[in-house]
């Protein structure tokens, strides 16, 4: 190394060395900016460049007089354009170029080329090696570089700089790091830009919609380099643009003043810039006071929801849910959040993992002398670079790595299954709670009280009150403020506006929130999800919480109205947003399906042991003013029970603006108060966030919120999003955040990451126990009697077989043609209709042509259903003729005449006896006559026929041994409804289905072995329930069985009456409840019954499991036997295989509607294999 270079290095770092030289030689690595400190090139590779001091006043040269002088003389368009490009051009040169090139077609281009060729003696050279590398420095990556480490020997004259001023409403800003950024010139300059010149970043002035910049998944679909411009601050003139990766960071952040940037030119090779040339900037980054200001979350949230609710880009993709789609505002919010993540990564800001160590290190730095750093010392620089790279992996904040392990570790430590087993048991006071809780329910009560931070009322193990007391919210990270290494602080000793001497700041980079105060865990939402398996007593558990903590202890006896809690849901009209709603601090609102309203009411009565507490059923206009009842009376109800339908109706009325301002102020409905606690039962009912029901429930306001559901996921993982949103779990309730960490990985088939994130989100707020779990002593949580599920496979009846084969042929042709042409998805609706028909035939031929409101495959306006009606009617007639008219007309008349001779009047039928069972007299409604004139019970005769067929024996009359035919039988029917006269008619076996025949047989066997049993029969088709009701009523007399039917067509009063009557044991006769799987598959307590029959399979096995668990749950004392009727060699057997597949891989694997359809197509192909 030369003596001159050694001397230069000493002068750079030592104030005591002086010189009178007017020029300073420095390396092309531009070591006057600390950003080049990590360079460690060999001396031989260094390029020495001479930069002369600028003549005094040259930087202030003005072009305004030249322009004004030319304007006075008049100018043409050529001169205007020329001065716009090169405003510094002298007047004589402007006029010369105008005279030479002004009249030519490409004159402006020729003039610029001539000017740059003849007015610059500086040759173009390359930028130093690797200019695109973004070298960064902040105090977190290299604390040894401080402003005091640099001692320039004299004050240099830098390029033009404005006096630094804070933006509007910004009170301070603080340095967080700097980037070395390579710019590309988009306009030429007349002379070299001076070192230290201040630049400015601007966004494109053109208003661009977020949808043009980002796609629906938040991914960039347009170049951002063209949207961020670099301006010379002296002339406010664009000179260049930044690279794409830097523009992706800057573009979203330049829209506000929360992040501030100072841009300084640090290298342009001491030459004028031509279009396409590169130059290097130092980008100093600051956080301003605005980003730390406490935000009006209620207002922003309301605005976000309003936009979301009315967004026209959100499309309905089917009945099973909708793909989550972001609004413009949500896309912009996500882009800003991602930009923050990338910026912190670029700056290599590391979160503080040990605050105590960070404080000790900070004290050492304050007390130590400034260190002189030799930038030319390769060993020192390489060590610093190594340290930076070793720490780089710790500074990745983007969502791909997301530092999820730390989050999951915390959650698992706080809410692992082992920790749940060791939870203390809280016993409710006998003064308020009448029932006896099981041990796991007492532990659950402890967990729920802790979730509501009612530590004084929960059993203590010495740790509860301290849990999370001073622990930082795991969604946030702690950072140490770096020393100010900005260019202005380093070179101009310019102090930025100071903030109070804080050492740390806190950031939730995933939500874009910042704080100067430590965000502790207690700020998290009160409430959670109780997701115990069906039958473990979620209703009783909820009431144990409500009665143990019936009111808000922070408010009761202090004030009646919560003035501070005035947030109004943004789903309501804007006229509501300024109204302060009273706080019902003593009331819990419980929202349930209508079918469970009576059950919840009865359960409260059973559980409540306090005369001071009561409940109110808010249904059917029974309360004139709910607001008055809850806030203006001394003893408001402890619980208000209502239904999803009531919530939806009130929200719809208000949200459509039907109420005036005055009406709103005196409104007395559910939205007129803020509740202390809100509990929603069967919470999966709000899983589709675009439905009216979901929006209505979201609009309810409460301090504590609980969701009860045994099946939080029905069809898609995104079903959980609505539960998270209802519970206000930040930042997960922000759709952009949910999409980034859950939906997008899931759609990308990265199931493990998506489920890991979901587990991390839900683990602290979700409690789930199953019947198979054991307590700390190894005993089952609940001792339930055994449950037996039997599949009974049945053959088709002859009429069913004929129908099924005809429909199967048509379905196979449609499916195979779709596969051959590759348009199977386009035939999706048609195929569903074919499948529906096949399923209906398996149940009963009478279902053919019906369109059931409960069927999941069809919408109510599906035209394909009705289009097949004529064809199916024709087919049914063919079947009827084939099986019912086995007699010719002459044969039928002759047989009837022979029977009339034997049985001339009604009295002759009174002595009829069945030759098989010897019953006398027979029930004439069930009597069948053979051609030989002998009579038998319908049931006995067909059992005989079935036995003979199974043995491949011929059918002969049990009496006379003459040949008989099952299709040539006669029955007795009344001539009309008002007459008692009986006549013979052909018996129609086509009206019987295999399942109904088998059901009747099973019910008769049960009646014979154990009279007085209560039986539940499930079907998803309400039309099938009608047929079953008719068959059962016809088969069993009122003395033998009582038939009930429960489906969606019943009113609340009728439902209550049916369930109450069915629950009463009658030892003299059988009670049979026909139950719609959709109306009664969840929530109902049917432990009074111990026998169930599933008449048809459901696509989702979890729905069937829920239905069975209506019987097999707490309170059941008998063994439960379930029989599933399946037609062999039919579509139903293949549906069983699909169910097993779903049980194996989980039902949450459907991502969006298109993905769900593709999976269903795979299932369809399985059905027709």
Swiss-Prot record:
Motif annotated as DEGH box, chain positions: 681-684
Domain Helicase C-terminal span(s) in chain numbering: 995-1165
RING-type zinc finger span: 914-961
Region (Disordered): 302-327
Keyword annotations from UniProtKB, A to Z: Acetylation, ATP-binding, Cytoplasm, DNA damage, DNA repair, DNA-binding, Helicase, Hydrolase, Metal-binding, Nucleotide-binding, Nucleus, Phosphoprotein, Zinc, Zinc-finger
Modification N-acetylserine occurs at: 2
GO MF, one annotated term: four-way junction DNA binding
Broad enzyme group: hydrolase
InterPro entries listed in its UniProt record: Helicase_ATP-bd, Helicase_C-like, HIRAN, P-loop_NTPase, SNF2-like_sf, SNF2/RAD54-like_C, SNF2_N, SNF2_RAD54_helicase_TF
GO biological process entries: DNA repair; double-strand break repair; error-free postreplication DNA repair; error-free translesion synthesis; error-prone translesion synthesis; free ubiquitin chain polymerization; postreplication repair; protein polyubiquitination
PANTHER family documented for this protein: DNA REPAIR PROTEIN RAD5, TRANSCRIPTION TERMINATION FACTOR 2-RELATED
Note: Present with 1520 molecules/cell in log phase SD medium.
Function: Probable helicase, member of the UBC2/RAD6 epistasis group. Functions with the DNA repair protein RAD18 in error-free postreplication DNA repair. Involved in the maintenance of wild-type rates of instability of simple repetitive sequences such as poly(GT) repeats. Seems to be involved in maintaining a balance which acts in favor of error-prone non-homologous joining during DNA double-strand breaks repairs. Recruits the UBC13-MMS2 dimer to chromatin for DNA repair.
Protein name: DNA repair protein RAD5
Lineage, opening ranks: Eukaryota, Fungi, Dikarya, Ascomycota, Saccharomycotina
Gene symbol of the encoding locus: RAD5
């Amino acid at each position: 190394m030369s003596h001159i270079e050694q001397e230069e290095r000493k002068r750079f770092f030592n104030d005591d060395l002086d010189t009178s030289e007017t020029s300073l030689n420095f390396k092309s690595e531009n070591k006057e900016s600390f950003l080049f400190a990590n360079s460690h090139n060999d001396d031989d590779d260094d390029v020495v460049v001479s930069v002369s001091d600028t003549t005094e006043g040259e930087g202030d040269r003005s072009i305004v007089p030249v322009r004004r002088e030319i304007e006075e003389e008049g100018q043409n368009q050529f001169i205007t354009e020329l001065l716009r490009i090169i405003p510094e051009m002298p007047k004589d040169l402007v006029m010369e170029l105008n005279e030479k090139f002004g009249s030519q077609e490409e004159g402006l281009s020729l003039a610029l080329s001539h000017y740059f060729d003849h007015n610059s003696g500086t040759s173009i050279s390359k930028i130093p090696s690797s200019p695109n590398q973004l070298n960064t420095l902040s105090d977190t990556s290299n604390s040894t570089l401080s402003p005091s480490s640099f001692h320039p020997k004299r004050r240099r004259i830098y390029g033009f700089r404005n006096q630094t001023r804070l933006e509007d409403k910004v009170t301070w800003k603080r340095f967080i790091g700097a980037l070395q950024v390579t710019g590309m010139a988009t306009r030429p300059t007349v002379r070299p830009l001076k070192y230290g010149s201040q630049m400015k970043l601007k966004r494109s002035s053109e208003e661009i919609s977020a949808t043009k910049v980002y796609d629906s998944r938040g991914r960039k679909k347009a170049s951002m380099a063209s949207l961020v411009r670099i301006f010379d601050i002296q002339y406010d003139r664009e000179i260049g643009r930044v690279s794409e990766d830097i523009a992706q960071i800057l573009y979203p952040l330049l829209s506000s003043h929360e992040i501030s940037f100072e841009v300084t030119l640090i290298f342009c090779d001491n030459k004028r810039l031509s279009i396409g040339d590169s130059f290097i900037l130092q980008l100093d980054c600051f956080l301003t006071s605005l980003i730390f200001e406490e935000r009006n979350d209620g207002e922003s949230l309301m605005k976000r929801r309003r936009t979301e609710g009315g967004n026209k880009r959100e499309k309905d993709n089917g009945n099973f849910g909708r793909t989550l789609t972001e609004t413009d505002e949500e896309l912009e919010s996500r882009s800003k959040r991602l930009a923050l993540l990338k910026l912190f990564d670029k700056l290599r800001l590391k979160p503080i993992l040990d605050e105590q160590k960070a404080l000790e290190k900070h004290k050492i730095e304050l007390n130590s002398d400034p260190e002189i750093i030799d930038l030319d010392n390769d060993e020192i620089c390489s060590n610093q670079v190594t340290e930076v790279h070793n720490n780089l992996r710790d500074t990745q904040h983007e969502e791909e790595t997301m530092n999820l392990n730390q989050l999951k570790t915390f959650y698992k430590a706080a809410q692992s299954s082992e920790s749940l087993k060791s939870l203390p048991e809280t016993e409710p006071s006998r003064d308020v709670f009448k029932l006896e809780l099981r041990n796991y329910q007492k532990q659950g009560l402890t967990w729920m009280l802790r979730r509501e931070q009612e530590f004084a009322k929960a059993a203590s193990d010495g740790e509860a009150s301290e849990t999370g007391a001073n622990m930082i919210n795991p969604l946030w990270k702690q950072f140490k403020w770096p020393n100010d290494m900005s260019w202005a602080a380093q070179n101009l000793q310019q102090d930025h506006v100071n903030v109070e001497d804080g050492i740390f700041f806190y950031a939730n980079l995933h939500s874009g929130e910042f704080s100067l105060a430590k965000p502790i865990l207690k700020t998290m939402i009160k409430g959670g999800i109780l997701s115990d398996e069906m039958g473990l007593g979620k209703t009783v558990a909820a009431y144990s919480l409500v009665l143990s903590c019936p009111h808000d202890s922070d408010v009761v006896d202090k004030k009646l109205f919560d003035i501070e809690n005035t947030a109004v849901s943004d789903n309501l009209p804007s006229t509501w947003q300024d109204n302060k709603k009273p706080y019902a601090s003593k009331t819990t609102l419980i929202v349930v399906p209508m079918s469970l309203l009576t059950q919840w009411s009865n359960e409260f009565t059973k559980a409540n042991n306090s005369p001071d507490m009561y409940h109110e059923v808010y249904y059917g206009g029974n309360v004139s003013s709910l607001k008055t009842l809850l806030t203006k009376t001394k003893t408001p109800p402890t619980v208000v029970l209502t239904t999803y339908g009531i919530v939806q109706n009130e929200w719809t009325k208000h949200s459509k603006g039907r109420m005036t301002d005055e009406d709103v102020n005196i409104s007395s409905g559910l939205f007129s108060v803020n509740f202390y606690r809100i509990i929603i039962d069967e919470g999966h009912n709000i899983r589709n966030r675009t439905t009216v029901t979901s929006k209505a429930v979201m609009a309810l306001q409460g301090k504590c919120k609980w969701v009860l559901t045994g099946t939080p996921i029905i069809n898609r993982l995104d079903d959980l999003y609505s539960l998270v949103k209802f519970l206000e779990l930040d930042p997960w309730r922000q759709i952009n955040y949910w999409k980034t960490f859950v939906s997008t990985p899931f759609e990308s088939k990265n199931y493990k990451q998506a489920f890991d994130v979901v587990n991390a989100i839900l683990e602290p707020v979700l409690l789930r126990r199953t019947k198979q779990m054991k307590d700390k002593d190894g005993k089952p949580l609940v001792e339930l009697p055994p449950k037996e599920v039997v599949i009974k496979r049945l053959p088709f009846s002859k009429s069913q077989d004929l129908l099924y084969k005809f429909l199967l042929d048509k379905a196979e042709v449609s499916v195979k043609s779709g596969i051959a042409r590759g348009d199977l998805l386009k035939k999706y609706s048609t195929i569903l209709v074919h499948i529906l028909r096949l399923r209906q035939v398996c149940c009963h031929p009478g279902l053919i042509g019906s369109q059931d409101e409960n069927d999941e495959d069809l919408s109510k306006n599906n035209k394909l259903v009705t289009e097949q009606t004529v064809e199916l009617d024709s087919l049914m007639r063919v079947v009827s003729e084939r099986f019912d008219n086995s007699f010719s007309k002459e044969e039928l008349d002759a047989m009837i005449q022979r029977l009339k001779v034997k049985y001339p009047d009604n009295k002759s039928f009174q002595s009829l006896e069945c030759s098989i069972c010897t019953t006398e007299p027979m029930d004439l409604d069930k009597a069948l006559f053979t051609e030989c004139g002998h009579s038998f019970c319908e049931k006995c005769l067909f059992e005989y026929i079935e036995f003979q067929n199974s043995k491949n024996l011929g059918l002969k009359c049990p009496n006379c041994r003459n040949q008989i035919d099952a299709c040539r039988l006669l029955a007795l029917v009344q001539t009309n409804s008002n007459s008692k006269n009986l006549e013979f008619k052909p018996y129609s076996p086509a009206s019987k289905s295999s399942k109904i025949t088998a059901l009747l047989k099973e019910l008769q066997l049960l009646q014979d072995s154990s009279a007085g049993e209560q039986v539940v029969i499930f079907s998803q088709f309400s039309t099938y329930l009608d047929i079953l009701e008719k068959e059962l009523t016809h088969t069993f007399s009122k003395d033998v069985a009582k038939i009930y039917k429960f489906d969606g067509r019943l009113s609340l009063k009728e439902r209550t009456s049916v369930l109450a009557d069915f629950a009463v044991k009658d030892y003299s006769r059988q009670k049979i409840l026909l139950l719609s799987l959709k109306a009664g598959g969840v929530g109902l307590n049917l432990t009074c019954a111990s026998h169930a029959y599933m008449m048809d399979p459901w696509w989702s096995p979890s729905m069937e499991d829920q239905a069975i668990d209506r019987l097999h749950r707490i309170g059941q004392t008998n063994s439960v036997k379930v029989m599933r009727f399946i037609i062999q060699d039919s579509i139903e057997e293949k549906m069983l295989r699909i169910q097993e597949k779903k049980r194996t891989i989980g039902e949450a694997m459907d991502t969006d509607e298109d993905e769900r359809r593709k999976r269903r197509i795979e299932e369809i192909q399985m059905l027709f294999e």
